[in-house]
Amino acid sequence: MANRLSLDDARHVLDAALDKAVEIGQPMNIAVVDDGGHLIAFARQDGAILGSIDIATGKARTSALMKLSTEDLGKAAAPQAPLYGIEVTNGGLVIFGGGIPLTDDGAVVGAIGVSAGSVEQDVSVAQAGVAALDGRG
């Protein structure tokens, strides 16, 4: 992968996430972005909530820019936590689960963002995409 997320890699991540969404029976919106948060691949499954399109891409963008999962960022952005209020910066960040960085040799090369199910379902589908890339190395 050479510390860069190719279209082929992004499709591999997307396909694994789509398979997981089918397995759990929840139509999803799934976005894969590069390390700058720019869209590489996207899919909206039949029946996925239309309002979740922006949320999926926002989760992926947030995770890539901040270099951590949106779930972890959410914990750090809770009231009284060190990053409280960060979600209003950078054009708006998403601070609940479903966005996870994609790494190559420890370097963040992009991220996946998933939305349309429960937060737990979104995280599970995103993790399937991450695992597919990790298994490719």
Residues covered by each model-derived region:
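Flexible, solvent-exposed loop/hinge segments and secondary-structure transition points
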Residues: 1-137
